[in-house]
């Protein structure tokens, strides 16, 4: 069975590296580039096919960039100092309980 890869970035590696430095600024820049529906309207008030394809590609690109941003934020939060503090307090609690048990 084939596997689906969620990182088809051959040409967009620069965009990923931009996310590492200022992810929210990059996403804001892309969201400003999305035009309103009036730019490619047909007579019936609907956007033409080329406009829909272009907007669909942009939406997918934005979704992927947001997913990468979320991943980077989550991995950076895991590596921050202070994560081990919960382990230290658990160890201190266990030591405190052991001392109380020894006194009884």
From Swiss-Prot:
The keyword Hydrolase does not apply. Expressed in brain, heart, lung, pancreas and skeletal muscle. It comes from the Eukaryota. GO terms for biological process: action potential; cellular response to cAMP; intracellular signal transduction; monoatomic ion transport; positive regulation of potassium ion transmembrane transport; protein localization; regulation of membrane repolarization. A lipid is attached at residues 5-6 (S-palmitoyl cysteine). GO terms for molecular function: protein kinase A binding. Transmembrane segments: none annotated. Residues 2-11 are annotated as: Required for membrane localization. It holds the Pfam family AKAP7_RIRII_bdg. Residues 86-104 have a biased composition (Polar residues). Residues 52-65 are annotated as: RII-binding. Residues 18-40 are annotated as: Required for apical membrane localization. One of its GO terms (cellular component) is lateral plasma membrane. Keywords: Cell membrane, Lipoprotein, Membrane, Myristate, Palmitate. Residues 72-104 are annotated as: Disordered. A lipid is attached at residue 2 (N-myristoyl glycine). Binds cAMP-dependent protein kinase (PKA). Interacts with PRKCA; only the cytoplasmic form is capable of interacting with PRKCA. Targets the cAMP-dependent protein kinase (PKA) to the plasma membrane, and permits functional coupling to the L-type calcium channel. The membrane-associated form reduces epithelial sodium channel (ENaC) activity, whereas the free cytoplasmic form may negatively regulate ENaC channel feedback inhibition by intracellular sodium. This is A-kinase anchor protein 7 isoforms alpha and beta. It comes from Homo sapiens (Human).
């Amino acid at each position: 069975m084939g596997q689906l890869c969620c990182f088809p970035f051959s040409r967009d590696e620069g965009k990923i590296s931009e996310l590492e430095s200022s992810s929210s600024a990059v996403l804001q820049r892309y969201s400003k580039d999305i035009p309103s529906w009036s730019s490619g309207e047909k007579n019936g008030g609907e956007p033409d096919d080329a406009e829909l394809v272009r907007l669909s590609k942009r939406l997918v690109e934005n979704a992927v960039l947001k997913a990468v941003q979320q991943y980077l934020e989550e991995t950076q939060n895991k590596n921050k100092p202070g994560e081990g503090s919960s382990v230290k307090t658990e160890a201190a609690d266990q030591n405190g309980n052991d001392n109380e048990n020894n006194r009884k």
